[in-house]
């Protein structure tokens, strides 16, 4: 007879491995399904300075490995597998994967959300080499340097404000002639002496040798191009939650995030959503870790009532 786990966690990022740690430590049989390696998007971050306990910071890959090891120390098992199909509505949840079919009484979805890329040549190869997607995560090394932020929404505006406090110069590049961000961001950005707006502009190329050295900007009205030197770029043109598997069964918001409140409970009993994949105000490593712990608290309640 195939094993039925108490909990299967889909995704091995900080939220997923925290859930696995808490579940395994509580004596629940726990399986983590991860298609790549520990850490998720966090593993791409060169330096994390805002996660407590590391006075000199830590890179995302190493932190992800440490989280995996902590969970496995208490008995959680990791299976490198991609999930192709899920059936979550029944009392026993079934997951079809590249490594076979797995069943569980509860499921924690920790599939995360990926930054939307600009789609210019060389972008993927430069990620982590002065090309970033999160100012709060990766901004600290740019103190006193020149950076660019691409985007015009709330995330881009927040990133530009964050960077303006540490960088010598911040270029905010937007394809329109005004910000889409809410008005609360406009005045602080306009008044920041080190923020310069590049209106009606898109990035047509990333200038680089082994690392980024600048951007090529294209005027959307005239087509004219110019080069802009910078030490780093922060791309903030939206995020895409990894929720394709769950569109049929789970309630999602208009942006595709799984609807779950601070309890992490979803629209299906026994199914929880944690980290960047769920509706929430702040998507950071530390809030993802919190979600993982909370999910196990409510999963234990659910299991006690549904054994």
Task: State what each model feature region is.
Residues 5-74, 157-183, 253:
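Beta1-alpha1 glycine-rich phosphate/pyrophosphate-binding loop at the start
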Residues 119, 124-141, 237-287, 291, ...:
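FAD-site-proximal beta/loop scaffold in flavoenzymes
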């Amino acid at each position: 007879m195939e094993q039925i786990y108490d909990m299967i966690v889909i995704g091995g990022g900080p939220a997923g491995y925290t859930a696995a740690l808490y579940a395994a430590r509580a004596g629940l049989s726990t399986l983590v399904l991860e298609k790549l390696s520990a850490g998720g998007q966090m593993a791409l971050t060169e330096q994390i300075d805002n996660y407590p306990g590391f006075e000199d910071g830590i890179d995302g890959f190493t932190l992800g490995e440490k989280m995996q090891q902590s969970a496995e120390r208490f008995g959680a098992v990791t299976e490198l597998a991609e999930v192709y199909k899920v059936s979550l509505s029944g009392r026993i949840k079934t997951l079809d994967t590249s490594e076979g079919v797995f069943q569980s009484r509860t499921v924690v979805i920790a599939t995360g959300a990926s930054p939307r890329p600009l789609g210019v040549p060389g972008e993927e190869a430069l990620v982590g080499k002065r090309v970033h997607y999160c100012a709060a995560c990766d901004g600290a090394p740019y103190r006193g340097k020149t950076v660019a932020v691409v985007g015009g929404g709330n995330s881009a505006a927040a990133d530009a404000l964050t960077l303006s406090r540490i960088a010598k110069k911040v270029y905010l590049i937007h394809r329109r002639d005004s910000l889409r961000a809410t008005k609360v961001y406009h005045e602080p950005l306009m008044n920041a002496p080190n923020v310069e707006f590049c209106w009606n502009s898109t990035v047509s190329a990333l200038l680089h040798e082994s690392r980024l050295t600048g951007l090529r900007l294209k005027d959307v009205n005239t087509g004219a191009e110019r080069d802009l030197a910078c030490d780093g770029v922060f791309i903030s043109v939206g995020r895409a939650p990894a929720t394709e598997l769950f569109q049929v069964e789970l309630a999602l918001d208009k942006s595709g995030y799984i609807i779950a409140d601070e309890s992490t409970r979803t629209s299906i009993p026994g199914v929880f959503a944690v980290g960047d994949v769920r509706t929430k105000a702040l998507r950071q490593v530390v809030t993802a870790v919190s979600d993982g712990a909370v999910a196990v608290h409510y999963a234990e309640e659910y299991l006690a009532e549904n054994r």
